[in-house]
């Protein structure tokens, strides 16, 4: 009985079964998936961005069944023999032969690597950075380009004033020197010293200059009232454009050398537009132009006089036609035959 109990407690087993039990009881080998580093515990409330980036960069293992039909393989054979027109193109050289050009741009990042602003907790911008529309139509601040235009107009006006001052200085230098010595005036019967005469001339000259300058200043103020608009219009002609945006862009971003060239052109244009003094045409020139107007009718009358000068000569009076002097007046008596003809013609006309 004791032996039966012992057998029931310890049943008989074959050697194969024992080996299987040993295998089962042993530690299982790790699979390739389990070979990676074990996940660490994550404390709530703390975000480790480096760990997220590593997880996103590591490619997930894909089984062959996940590939869709028509997807290109990344095998070296297919990548080598498949055409890539976006990377390799041919352009023509000067002789017309095709030349291979490689556009080696970095590969675009997958969508999974792009972090959204909501995930990172960063405030997002609605307008994309590097918007092509912003490059085509740049938003120029109105105050900036207006300030540049005002500065350019002030420089043009300053240069024109400098030129006028230089001209006046030259005119003053060209004036004749003071006459030395005193002169006798027949009106007063006294000697006038040279200093007083020079002062009188200066005052008269200054009075004329002040009158002319006041006239010119009034005209210039009227013309330069819209000075900025005038400069803007001249810039349109210089740059050969009608677009206000192009002129605004030029005012803000043009190099200084180009602005200096444009300033010289603006200066010459404004100097031509300014009015000339009223005394610019001398009186001699006007007098010389007056006979030229009356010359054509005189030329028409001259040819008959030149052709028959003898006909115009006065024939000598006959004895019967000699005038009689009554005081200072000359009286010429006509023939009696002529008087009778006149008398007969009068009653005929009356009838």
Curated annotation (Swiss-Prot):
Classification via InterPro entries: TBATA-like
Assigned keywords, A-Z: Cytoplasm, Developmental protein, Differentiation, Spermatogenesis
Chief location of this protein within or outside the cell: cytoplasm
Keyword Cytoplasm: yes
GO biological process entries: cell differentiation; spermatogenesis
Any one annotated GO CC term: cytosol
Bias (Basic and acidic residues) ranges: 167-181, 292-302, 340-351
Compartment(s) where it occurs, according to its Swiss-Prot or TrEMBL record: Cytoplasm, Cytosol
Keyword Cytoplasm recorded: yes
Residue ranges, annotated region (Disordered): 16-40, 167-186, 195-216, 292-351
Top-level lineage group: Eukaryota
Family, as annotated: Belongs to the TBATA family.
Function summary: May play a role in spermatid differentiation. Modulates thymic stromal cell proliferation and thymus function.
Designated name of the protein: Protein TBATA
